[in-house]
Regions:
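P-loop NTPase motor domains
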Residues: 1-183
Length: 183
């Protein structure tokens, strides 16, 4: 198994609600674009809009854990975390809706999308686990030039999603820096 650098979008240092919302929106927007036989539905969006922020607040999370969130046989601890969310709407969602049997096909459809990413070993190594690169710190270091060398041939099906996640993360850091400079 080759060593790869990791930039995990779920591994965020800044856990203020604004950053969590921005990061969750970025992750959701990219997951929507994964080609699958299932059309991306409002119910799928609803599930992800509630699950992703819970994992971002929790910390030490990943796409693998988001995938586990969709498995009702293995997600009891994550549901409990959702019920304790500081966001009242999320808390209510996990209390009242998430375990409803009518959502099982929706969660399976979300899991299929996630599996497409997780099954790509290189993508999984690059995006899951503890981040080994502090991209925000590197971006804020004067005079630093950051180059990503991504071999498309090694990630035929997940290459564009990996690139979009990196661009999304960079945009969040850049917007945060712009906000700091204004203050």
């Amino acid at each position: 198994n080759e060593k790869t650098p990791t930039i995990n979008p779920f591994d965020i240092e800044d856990k203020n609600e604004s950053n969590i919302k921005q990061t969750a929106k970025m992750i959701l927007s990219i997951l929507k674009d994964i080609n699958d036989d299932d059309k991306f539905s409002g119910a799928m969006s609803d599930v992800l809009e509630n699950c992703i922020p819970v994992l971002l607040r929790k910390g030490n999370s990943s796409f693998i854990e988001l995938y586990r969130f969709m498995n009702d046989k293995r997600n009891k601890d994550l549901i409990e975390l959702g019920k304790k969310s500081i966001n009242d709407l999320e808390s209510e969602y996990f209390e009242d809706k998430f375990c409803d049997s009518s959502l099982s096909t929706t969660k399976e459809a979300v899991a299929r999308r996630l599996r497409k990413l997780i099954n790509d070993e290189l993508f999984s190594n690059l995006m899951n686990g503890k981040s080994t690169i502090n991209l925000e710190q590197l971006m804020n270091t004067k005079g630093k030039i950051i180059i990503f060398r991504i071999l498309k041939s090694n990630m035929l099906h997940s290459y564009k999603f990996y690139a979009r996640f990196i661009i999304g993360i960079i945009q969040i850091f850049a917007l945060k820096r712009a906000n700091l400079e204004e203050k």
